[in-house]
Amino acid sequence: MATATYPPPPPYYRLYKDYSENPNSAPEPPPPIEGTYVCFGGNYTTEDVLPSLEEQGVPQLYPKDSNLDYKNELRSLNRELQLHILELADVLVDRPSQYAKRIGEISSIFKNLHHLLNSLRPHQARATLIHIMELQIQQRKQAVEDIKRRREEAQRLLKDAYLTLDGQ
């Protein structure tokens, strides 16, 4: 009884056998998934929406203002977090049975901090793309200048060679 070293290829490889001669012979890829889908037992959505803190069942500790100063709110939440951690240390020393309330407050502060940071991600991504594109423009301008400089140098060398050959 003979056994194969490798398993046989999947049957759909036949769909691509003429690809080298005619790239259009391959089947079109499936359309992108829209809406919700299940992956490894979890439900996911293709809409990239940040759920509000209320939807997550977490009290919002910063104002619900559209003109929110993220920097100041992050600083104040950070200070509040430090204060609550110190209070937790005091509670653990004096009243160890009441630590659960402090842990819940610290958890709420962390969730608010993370929500604020996650709401800044689109702005950060946009700024990163702008920076990358500016770098690409700068690199391309430098490449064009380098090409011009090398072209002028090549023209000068050709002119010198022509004059040298013409003078002999």
UniProtKB/Swiss-Prot annotation:
Top-level taxon of the source organism: Eukaryota
Chief location: nucleus
UniProt keyword Transcription regulation, yes or no: yes
One Pfam family linked to the record: Med7
Coiled-coil ranges from the UniProt annotation: 64-92, 132-166
Keyword Transcription: yes
Keywords, comma-separated and alphabetical: Coiled coil, Nucleus, Transcription, Transcription regulation
Subcellular location: Nucleus
Gene Ontology molecular function: transcription coregulator activity
Any single Gene Ontology cellular-component annotation: mediator complex
GO biological process, one term: regulation of unidimensional cell growth
Subunit structure: Component of the Mediator complex. Interacts with MEE14/CBP1.
Family stated for the protein in its record: Belongs to the Mediator complex subunit 7 family.
Its job: Component of the Mediator complex, a coactivator involved in the regulated transcription of nearly all RNA polymerase II-dependent genes. Mediator functions as a bridge to convey information from gene-specific regulatory proteins to the basal RNA polymerase II transcription machinery. The Mediator complex, having a compact conformation in its free form, is recruited to promoters by direct interactions with regulatory proteins and serves for the assembly of a functional pre-initiation complex with RNA polymerase II and the general transcription factors.
Protein name, UniProt field: Mediator of RNA polymerase II transcription subunit 7a
Species classification: Eukaryota, Viridiplantae, Streptophyta, Embryophyta, Tracheophyta
Gene name per UniProt: MED7A
